[in-house]
Amino acid sequence: MNIKENDLPGIGKKFEIETRSHEKMTIIIHDDGRREIYRFNDRDPDELLSNISLDDSEARQIAAILGGMVYKPQALESIEMAFSDLIIEWFKVEKGAKSIGRTLGELDVRQNYDVTVIAIIKHNQEKLLNPGADSIIEENDTLVLSGERKHLKKLIHDFLSGEGV
């Protein structure tokens, strides 16, 4: 699958997606939380086949279904309450970040920040699920992180953003 990400200043982000079977869609995530999904004709990319608009809550529920979670509204609500402080965040390693060229073991994010690195999506789209301590972080890698928001923010500031330099 090929995904192109573009900033839309004043609007949000646009993701252009082409699946392995060459089907194309565009997802726009607005700064206010709304999502729009557009599905295009594979033979004529200018022909819109369908579109749908979702609010933030609807998009998250659909993401849970697509992500393979068993969808039961009552169970989902109790999970959200039990893990209200636990979040999963995707963060692209910025130019100049202190983590570039270092291994996960060197950073010891679990011990030092109480954060778990679930996956690393390398800049060439290679996916490392449950990466080991010897996994090297490179500029433009996307890290999938799990932890409390305050711990994630500190890790991102200290090692993943260009701000920590």
From Swiss-Prot:
Q: Does the keyword Endoplasmic reticulum apply?
A: no
Compartments (UniProt record): Cell membrane
According to the entry, every stretch annotated as the RCK C-terminal domain falls at: 76-161
One Gene Ontology term, aspect cellular component = plasma membrane
This protein's record includes keyword Cell membrane: yes
Alphabetical UniProt keywords: Cell membrane, Membrane
What is the role of the protein in this entry? Required for activity of the potassium/proton antiporter KhtU. Involved in protection of the cell from methylglyoxal, a toxic by-product of glycolysis.
Q: What is this protein called?
A: K(+)/H(+) antiporter subunit KhtT
Q: Which organism is it from?
A: Bacillus subtilis (strain 168)
